[in-house]
Each structure stands twice: as C-alpha cells, then as structure tokens.
Amino acid sequence: MMISDLPHDLESEILSRVPAKSLAKWKTTCKRWYALFRDPSFVKKNFDKAGGREMIVLMNSRVYSNSVNLQGINNRFDPSMEVTGKLIKLNDSKGVDISAIFHCDGLILCTTTESTGLVVWNPCTGEIRCIKPRIFYRCNDRYALGYGNSKSSCHSYKILRSCCYYVDQNLSLMAAEFEIYDFSTDSWRDLGDITRDMIVYSSGVSLKGNTYWVSGSKEKGFFMRYFDFSKEVFGRLPLPYQSFNANHTAALSAVGNEKIAVLQQKILAMSDEMRIWVTNKIDEAKDLSWSNFLLTVDYGKFNLPCLVNVTSFLLDEENKVAVCSDVDTKDGLRSRIYIVGKDFYKEVFKDTRGSDNNWPLLLCYVPSLVSIQENIPNKAEENEIKGG
C-alpha cells in the first residue's frame, strides 16, 4: 500500500511527523499535498511536533547556519561547530547588509543596515516578504515579530516597531513611537505613545507569539518587559535579580517552546562571573518563577586573555552548558563562539576578520512551513505541481 492510498486523516497524521524541510521539497508532488502543506492547522501541527532545532548566527552583516555537536560533552568528548553555509540569498543577489535578525515561529525578520526596509523570510520554504515603512524608518528603531491569538488555527502575524528618543539637548525629555504592521491587511497602524518606559538592555526573544526584553531604571530596578501581540499592550515580569546597576549586562534566550533563560554579567565591574537562570513554563494564568542558579561560570579559572562580554547565548539544560557569542577585544574585534559550563570552556569558532560594528547574534531556529505570502501558487510552482 502506498501512502496515497491511505485515508486522508491518517495520511495527514503521518506527514505531520516528517521534518518541515523534507515536506518543503515534496510540496509539488501533487495538488493534494500542496494544499495540505499550506493548510494552517497542518502547519501548526507539524511545527509543534518538530524535534530538530538549528542554530543561526548574524556576523558581519550576514546570516549563517551553524551546526554544533554537544554529544558526549559530559564524557569529556570535545564539542565541535561547523559553519554550514550562508543563508540569506539576498546578500548575494542584491548586496543587502543585515543589521539585526529576529526569529518567531520559523520566520526570520531582517533589518537592513541602512534602515531602508524590513524583510521577513522563511528559510524552509524560501518565501520572502518585503515590508515598506508607513512613513520612514529611524536608525534606532527596534523591531519584533510575533502573533496574536486567532479563533482560527492560523496565527495572525504582526511586527512591532518601537522607537524611543530624546527631543531636547539636555536629554531630559523623551518621546516614543509605536507602530504595528499586520500581515493580514498589509498595513501599519499607529499605537500612539503607549509607554515611555522602553529602555531595554537586551535583544528581544519570542515565546508563544509574545516578545520579551530586559528593561530597567534606577527607580524600578531590572525587570523583564514583554509585548502581548494579542492585546497589543506592554507588561512587566520579575527577574531573579531586582537591583539596578549600570555595571550589569544581560541577555535573554528562549529555551524550547515554554521557557526563557536570562544571563547576567557584571562586566563593567571587571567581574569574571556569569550566571544563568531559567523560568518555569511561562503561562499567563500562573505567576512567573525562576530556578536557582542553573549555571554559574567563573571565567577566571580558564585564564582567558580578556574579559568575556556575552552578546547572545543558547542554553542546553540537559548538559548544563551554554553556547555563547561575543567579540574578542584582544584580537582585532573578531567574533567568536564558544561552549562553556561550570568547569568547561571550548572555543569552537572565530571569525577571520573583525569590525567595530560586529556584534554576533545567535538564534535557535525551528524550520516551519508557515506561509507569509498570499495563498496563491506562483507560476513556477503551478508548472511543477503534479496531478492528484
């Protein structure tokens, strides 16, 4: 019996367990599969069952895919990393330089270095959507990609643009701009000055459609700021450390689909210590709580030539190690990636050149079939799709 002879429900269940990258190659096999792989309920089921995660990194205005092998690390086997290729095809064809990336639901939001536009890209399907500004982009804009809850199985994807800036020479008066781009209407909406408490100390991370940052002030201390894309409002959550100190730096990272990790350093106080905490499963109906120190690293014991200032990280809870990125200030500002644990440090990658503006960013990426274009096949796909 062939899979095409199975009842459609059983066929759909079997295919939902196949990696999205393989399904993307099969989408033109027949009309039925093409329609199935674009069905929002099937796309969500396939994404929820996804086991494989990949790592991507932004370096030197380019986005690369990486492969990190941590197997056997607790048995003293050396981990390794391979830069497997450049991802963004725009880099080669149009010379587009990327200044920031943001991952949500298998989609990558790219900001160009000249602030000329936004590009939303699905690496799995190859779909690209260019977003034009409502009026213009500012060089200090921040962008986040998320989605609101919908009665249908299809997520309602949105982009948040936020910009806070001073309007006087004394730096005492601050203005703020907030806009939402809605994929379903292909348009921007002005949210007004909904908050001016938007000074953030970390890159944003997406979890369950919402975006989280580390924020803080002398009056309020450090806290976790989040934006709810369903209600289109900001909220606050506690961090495991509350006091505000300008010597502290922080980074956030999503841990699977349920938790967030925060990394803290006292880098400007010349401290070699790094601490990482992890939340419980984030649920709007429950209070947020944090683990005790999941991982505390004293970089001093590794006799490194300079202080480590982590710009981004990915946490492996099982092995209690973190894959971190930073810039080696003693070696031409070259980006480096290393794996670190309580008693373990291994550099697995160093860039061949440095740059004053080169701050590497690591992201955990999950391939997805989600479509960001109109549900109409292009001419090339129409010609490829077989009958049935």
Swiss-Prot record:
InterPro entries: F-box-assoc_dom_typ1, F-box-assoc_interact_dom, F-box-like_dom_sf, F-box_dom, Gal_Oxase/kelch_b-propeller, SCF_F-box_component. Residues 1-50 form the F-box domain. It comes from the Eukaryota. Coiled coil: none annotated. Kelch repeats lie at residues 163-208, 336-383. Disulfide bonds: none annotated. The keyword Repeat applies. The keyword Repeat applies. Pfam families: F-box, FBA_1. Keywords: Kelch repeat, Repeat. This is F-box/kelch-repeat protein At3g17530.
